[in-house]
Amino acid sequence: MFKTGLYLFSNDLRLDDNPSLRLAASDMDYLVCLYAQDDTPSSASRQGSVDRSDHRNQFLHESLVSLDSSLQSYGHRLVFRKQPLTDAAAELIYSHSVTHIYRSVSVGRHLNHQWDVLKKEHPTITFQQRHSHTIFKPEDLPFTVDSLPFTFSKFRKQVESILVGFPAPKPKSLPPPPPNLAKEKSVPNLSDVTPSCYFTGGENIGWAHVNEYFNKGLASTYKTTRNGLDGMDYST
């Protein structure tokens, strides 16, 4: 029996430093990559207002376009659904005989609720997740998460001697999409939003900013800029 994975993108719109995606790439025969944007009124009561600013919409859209472009270099497209994640995932599970579901660990209450609902509604599917948003994994810490120090200084003193692991490299290849995935919709155009001249979304843009930040030695001014509320050269 073929193993078909469904990867749920959320706040990890990148291929680099994505352990869950690497896991899916190594284990699956086929792979579906999904981003579901839930703008329904019922979602607003759980997540706050679904009315995003034009700039936020533009940034998200640019990030999705960048991810879709990166996936195309692997022979993939990002499946985009404008509906609740649980509904979008369920449709793909049945239409593509999904056997495994992957995601990055999330601290979001709504995202975790959706994950739990999917696990409950699809008990025969294998669910796997990996940490990708933090410098340390819980098992790296010299204390349990429940015993987290109350102040940053105390936390820093306990963890500054821990070696930070290297970011997970992007997969060398991805399993092919299922044969009938071509009919699925990808990222739509967003022509009604005025582009921001200040911030641009996308993994490649993010890497460019990180490289520029450290190449300019800006980390050495951290103590004088860490409280800045905006600006490309502030904080880390």
Which functions belong to the PLM regions below?
Residues M1-P167:
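Trp/Phe/Arg-rich N-terminal binding region typifying the photolyase-homology
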Residues S161-T236:
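Catalytic cores of enzymes that engage adenine nucleotides and/or redox cofactors via long glycine-rich
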